[in-house]
Structure formats: C-alpha cells, structure tokens
Amino acid sequence: MIAIDEFQARAGEWIAANKSHAPRDYGAICPPDLVGAGLDWQRRIHAAGYAGIHWPEEHGGRGLTAEHNAAWQYECAVAGVPSVFNMVGLVLAGGAILRFGTPEQQTRHLQATLDTTHVWCQLFSEPGAGSDLGGLTTKAERDGDRYIVDGQKVWCSGGRYSNWGILMARTNPEAPKHDGISFFLCPMDLPGIEVRPLRQMTGEAEFDEVFFTDVELPANHLLGPLHGGWGVGMAVLTSERGHIGTSVIGLERRLESMSKLAEGRQLSTSQRQRLVQLISKGSAFKAMAQRQGPIASTAASLLKLGITEMMFESARLRGDIAGPEAMLDGPEAFGMLQAPGGRIAGGTSQVQRNIIGERLLGLPREPKPERS
C-alpha cells in the first residue's frame, strides 16, 4: 500500500495539473449553476483514481485507508477545489451502502455513484422534524412487493439534479418513534414525487422540498433491517459531521481575508480582541482536525460545533469591521445572511452540545417528553 505522504504528494501534483478544469470549491452542496462543471470534475477525479479512495477495490475504489482519503480532502481544500461533486452520494449514501447494503445493492449503486451515473440527495428532514429527526411522519406502508410512500421532506440539497435519494420513512407507527423508522434507496423519477426549490434569504436556492404522494417504492430498495433505519441514519449523519474537518481550511482563509479587510481601518479594542480570539481558535481547530484523522462521532460533533460557531462569529465580526459597507450587496452582506444557516445544517449547535455533554462529558441525558 502506498504511504500516505507519497499519496498526498502525488494527489497535490495531480490537482495542480488539473485545477484549471475544476469549479470553485462550493463545499458540501453543488449550486445548480455549477452542476455541469461539477459532474465533469467528478468524472475526471474518478478516471484518475481519486474517487472512492478508501472504498474496496471490488466496488471501484482504491482499497486505501480513511487517512489516505483525508489527505486527498486536505489537498483539495488547500487548492480551493471540490474533493467530490456529490458529497451525499460518495460520503453518505455510499458509506451506508458499503456498510448495510446487500450484494445486489452494492453492485448496482457503488460504481455508478463513483462515476456520476447515480447522483444522490438526502431525504431526512421534514417541516416538523429537523433536529428531532425521530419525529418524522413520512410513512411507507408495505403493499405486497412494494411500499407506498406519502409525506414531505424539506432542506433537500440537490434534489433537482439527483436521480436517487436516501430516504428515512416511518414503517411502524405503533413503535416508539426511533424504532419504527426504515431506510430506503429511492429513485427520484418515480411517479408521485414532486421537487420544489426553496429560496433562501441570500437569494440562492440551494435546497428543495420534496413531496411524496402514493409513491410506489419497490421493497428491495430497503437498506438495512426493517424498522432499523434509525441506526442506519445515525451512521450516515456521523459520516456527514466527520466530513466537516476540511472546513477548517475555509475558515482559515476567511480569517486571513478578514485580517486584510481590517488593515488600515481603525478597529475598536473589542474588535481587535475578537479578531485575535478567532485567529487563535482557528489555529487550535486546525491542529485538532489534523491530529484527529478519521473522526469518531463525539469528536465530529465537537469539530462541527466549533467550526460552525466560529464561522458565525467571523461573519458578524467581518460585518462590524466593514461598517456601512456590510449593508451593500457584496461578500460581507452575503456572509452575514448565510452564516446563521451553518448553525442548523448537518445538526444544530444545540444538538451537538447535547451529544458532547452526554457522550463525552457524561452529563445526564436531556429529558425526553416521549419517554416520560
């Protein structure tokens, strides 16, 4: 097996030689206007052997380690290019199928996900079940060799351009809420599925809401055990939060940009203190991410909480430094409008604090009304 240092050096050289073909680094969600460029970039990555780096070779991967994959992500973040086109596909859906999928599901989906034949979206959150995902009400009722799915999902990233989705739905309404959920692989072109874009206060429409009306989903699209979807979903979300480690690079760049913005301006004592504190914390989180390597569940929550809270505070400080300019249509205004969403996406800051308190610090569990 190739050493990580050698692999990282080769990856950096390949990125430098091919960077001109890449779209800008858009993070976890590809904006609709960059889908074509993102697909082309993913195909180029796949052809060069940098897609599914830590996946088994029999499923189209390189058979390397998670540390090799982290090295690839780091080099991409430093270069300012996407490490994958479809994070939901390669990190979430792919990881779930590798761990819980039948041989038939793995054969059908994994190679197709690496080469962009299958593009995935996440169908978890609902209007009344976001952070409290266990309260979801979308139902999937068994009817012979199929499930009939009815309900609504929201905050679905990439729903408009995805042809597959990972879906959590309630299959046993009589069971305790976490025990009656199942996990499905859902074709997005089934009759009865309607996708509508959601306009955000930034003016963008990164997310969609998805409606299911008498959708007939084949029973063999169930992933993992019947009524065992909560465990599958939690494994998926841990992968999502672990993927945030490369956001440290983006945070570092944002702080460098803010330092340049502050040059030549008369900052207050409070603003100088806030800037120094953010830079110090950013250095600490960078060291933590580099030391951590593959991130376990609790550490992923710690890193996710720290980075998103720092992103929020840095956007506020940048707006304060910019002064009246922050009210104009530009990067400062966009950053201030976008920042609050980071404390919600991928699990709210409140949820991350509960995970850290209960699993890392051993504090009493938060009271659950449904268990009373």
Per-segment meaning from a language model:
Residues 8, 67, 71-72, 92, ...:
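Glycine-rich phosphate/cofactor-binding loops in nucleotide/flavin-utilizing enzymes
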Residues 1-87, 108, 112, 244-245, ...:
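Amphipathic, small/basic residue-rich leader segments at the start of a protein or domain
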Residues 138-141:
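A structural signal for short hydrophobic beta-strand segments in well-ordered beta-sheet cores
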Residues 116-124, 168:
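A short, Trp-centered hydrophobic/proline-enriched beta-strand micro-motif
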Residues 46-117, 158-164, 282, 289, ...:
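Internal helix-loop-helix
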Residues 2, 7, 193-286, 342:
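Glycine-rich beta->alpha junctions and the first turn(s) of the following alpha-helix
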Residues 129, 154-160, 201-202, 341-348:
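Glycine-rich phosphate/pyrophosphate-binding beta-alpha loops
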Residues 145-146, 150-196:
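A short core secondary-structure module
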